[in-house]
Structure formats: structure tokens, C-alpha cells
């Protein structure tokens, strides 16, 4: 049976980028892709918040990340649809503008406040009377699935093996993981990297391994070209007053860790952050509801959720009031400290994590590049700071 240097499980942005970078380092790589349509990469906005660094690590990674995105289509030989557009963080009418703006002062490039009239110059579909203004900054953007497809294309061009199959388990011999099983056969690898985002905890729990990695259930409404809005939406719209990051901090607090290990439990009530982005082909995505529940499978009233998201964005953008669209959901991963969980799982050789990215489109690309170099012998203190062992 053929043994590869690395088996990478998961083909979202994390697995696609990691498999490509490992192959560039001369490693033999098997990428296993379950082709699950409900992935966080597929249903993301595709935004690149390169302006949002708050410390030396995040600033350096986001600068490196946006530089990678600007040249990536040429490098990979396939289009990612990278562009820069205006991000508008809208402030609802009647809200305290100063209070809404203050949390953004910490960022490397703080978004600037604009009046309702100026916001409507940037995005004519906004209802001027519905907002007290907005914070705006230039924001990177890619087509998420085309980005993954571009990585996969370049990976296969270098001889990487891309298998469409689910992974049913990890092959474990004592304290060593030696491969994975699929419905048809087992595959052997010197090292296995789990890049499965919100499904990572479930995979690890199946072998009685517990690490502090978490997920939300994110919901969006996709408006297809058949169902398309007639008018172009120029900007990416998101709320300036958003509770998701504070909620993630509460949901990952060590005091609630037992709930994650003995679920299912609702950790916090759902959060609705009204937003919308239109891709270059006119496809439109409306979002988003985040549910903080430890279950991987969750029963949701899809019609009611979709209606709430459409109504919320239509209050600011009446052009969207009549669209229908299709409701989707996915698991979105996050960690306790905002940094990803990388590297070897303690006390179990052969198994690595590459998951838990809070801002994957902004910082994952340079992290994948550095991780692949680190994994093949190049010391990197930044990768050391992201290792799973920091929580053990």
C-alpha cells in the first residue's frame, strides 16, 4: 500500500491551501475531499479584512495575506476573482455613532465614518433614512469556491492526489495515527492533517481527543442568477454593531468547556448580523444568523430563518425586499484566543491540526505557506505560537 508524506483531510480554504503548500515543499500529498456542499468556505462572503490587524502577529499576517491574494491567480494559473471593494459597516438610525465607531479604533487601518449621504454615494441601494451613517474601508474579496478550485488545480498540476471521498475514521496504532479510513479502503500517511473546520471537534472526539476548538452554525440566503436582483450592489454591507466576536469569546470560555464535551447544548441565543455581498457574476449572498450550539447537526426552521435575514437587510436596502433565494447553513470554526490551532496533537504522534481560523481569507494563506515550511524543517516562532500545545 502506498504511503504518502501527508494526508490532508478537508478541502475548504484551509485544506486546499495547505495541500498546495505542502506539495510545493516537495511532499507527497493525498487531499481527501468529501465534496460536502455545506462548507464554511462555500457559504462565506469571501471577504478579506486585511485592515483589521490588532497586534504584531495579525498585522504581519494580514499584510502578507493581501499581498498573496493580489498575485495568486497568476501563481495558481486559475482565476480567484480577487478584487478590492468598499466595505460599509452600517450604523442604524438612532444609534450612538461614537459608541459604534469606538471599537474600530484599535485596527491597523481604522474604518472612517461617513454620513448617510456619503454612504449612499458608495452604495446607492442603501436607504439613507435607515442609517445614521457607516464606517468604511477598502476590503479584499474573492470568490470562495473559485479560490479553492484554483488551489486544487495547481495542487494536481504538481502531482498531488485529490480523492473525493468521506473519511470514516483515523487509523490508530497505539499512540500513533498512521492513516485514515474511507468507505472503500484505508490510506496510509506519515502524517495526517485535519483541516475540517467546524467538524474538527467531532473527528477528534471519535478517538477520545479533546482540544479547545469550537463552531457556530452560520446561515445565509443565496440569491441565484435565476432569482437575481436587477440592480448592481457595489459594496459589501455588514453591521458596525456586531456581537458575534464577543459571543465567540463567551462560547469558548473554559468554564463552558464541559458543555462542549457533553452536548448538545445551546451556549448562547442566536445572533443576526444583517449583511450582503454581490459577486462579480451578479450572484448575491445575504447573511447571516449565527447559532451557538454544540451539536453538529441541528434542526432549524429554514423558512423562518431565511425570512428574518431577508427582512433585516431589506430595512437598509429596499431593493432586496422582494427577493426569495435559498437558505443554506454551515459550521464555522473558531478558537479561544483568535489564533488557529496548528501542528501536532499532544500525546498522539502523526496527527496534526490545521483549523480554527477566525479570519481565514485574511490570514490563512501566509500561515499555510509558513506551516508547510515549518513542517519540512524550517523553524518558525510564529507557527510555534499557534500550536495546539499552547492549551495543554
PLM ranges: what are they?
Residues 24-42:
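Glycine-rich FAD pyrophosphate-binding loop
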Residues 4-30:
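N-terminal Rossmann-like FAD-binding beta1-loop-alpha1 element of flavoenzymes
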Amino acid at each position: 500500500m502506498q504511503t504518502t508524506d501527508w494526508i490532508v483531510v478537508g478541502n475548504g480554504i484551509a485544506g486546499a491551501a495547505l495541500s498546495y503548500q505542502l506539495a510545493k515543499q516537495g511532499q507527497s500529498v493525498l487531499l481527501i475531499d468529501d465534496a460536502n456542499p455545506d462548507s464554511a468556505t462555500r457559504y462565506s462572503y469571501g471577504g478579506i479584512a486585511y485592515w483589521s490587524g490588532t497586534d504584531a502577529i495579525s498585522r504581519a499576517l494580514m499584510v502578507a495575506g493581501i499581498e498573496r491574494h493580489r498575485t495568486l491567480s497568476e501563481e495558481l494559473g486559475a482565476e480567484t476573482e480577487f478584487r478590492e471593494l468598499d466595505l460599509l459597516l452600517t450604523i442604524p438610525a438612532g444609534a450612538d455613532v461614537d459608541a459604534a465607531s469606538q471599537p474600530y479604533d484599535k485596527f491597523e487601518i481604522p474604518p472612517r465614518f461617513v454620513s448617510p449621504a456619503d454612504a449612499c454615494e458608495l452604495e446607492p441601494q442603501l436607504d439613507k433614512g435607515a442609517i445614521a451613517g457607516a464606517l468604511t474601508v477598502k476590503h479584499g474579496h474573492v470568490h470562495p469556491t473559485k479560490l479553492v478550485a484554483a488551489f486544487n488545480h495547481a495542487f494536481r498540476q504538481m502531482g498531488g492526489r485529490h480523492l473525493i471521498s468521506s473519511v470514516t475514521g483515523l487509523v490508530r496504532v497505539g499512540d500513533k495515527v498512521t492513516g485514515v479510513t474511507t468507505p472503500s479502503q484505508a490510506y496510509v500517511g506519515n502524517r495526517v492533517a485535519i483541516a475540517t473546520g467546524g467538524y474538527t471537534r467531532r473527528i477528534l472526539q471519535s478517538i477520545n481527543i479533546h482540544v479547545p476548538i469550537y463552531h457556530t452554525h452560520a446561515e445565509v440566503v443565496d440569491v441565484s442568477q435565476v432569482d437575481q436582483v436587477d440592480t448592481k450592489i457595489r459594496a459589501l454591507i455588514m453591521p458596525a454593531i456586531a456581537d458575534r466576536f464577543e459571543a465567540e469569546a463567551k462560547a469558548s470560555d473554559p468554564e463552558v468547556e464541559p458543555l462542549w464535551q457533553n452536548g448538545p447544548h445551546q451556549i448562547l441565543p442566536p445572533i443576526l448580523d444583517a449583511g450582503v455581498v454581490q459577486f462579480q457574476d451578479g450572484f448575491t449572498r445575504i447573511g447571516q444568523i449565527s447559532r451557538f450550539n454544540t451539536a453538529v447537526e441541528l434542526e432549524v426552521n429554514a423558512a423562518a430563518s431565511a425570512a428574518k435575514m431577508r427582512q433585516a437587510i431589506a430595512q437598509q436596502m429596499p431593493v432586496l425586499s422582494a427577493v426569495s433565494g435559498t437558505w443554506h447553513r454551515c459550521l464555522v470554526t473558531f478558537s479561544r484566543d483568535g489564533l488557529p490551532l496548528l501542528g501536532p496533537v499532544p500525546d498522539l504522534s502523526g496527527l496534526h491540526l490545521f483549523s480554527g481560523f477566525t479570519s481565514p481569507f485574511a490570514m490563512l494563506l501566509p500561515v499555510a505557506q509558513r506551516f508547510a515550511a515549518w513542517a519540512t524543517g524550517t523553524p518558525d516562532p510564529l507557527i510555534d505560537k499557534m500550536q495546539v500545545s499552547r492549551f495543554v
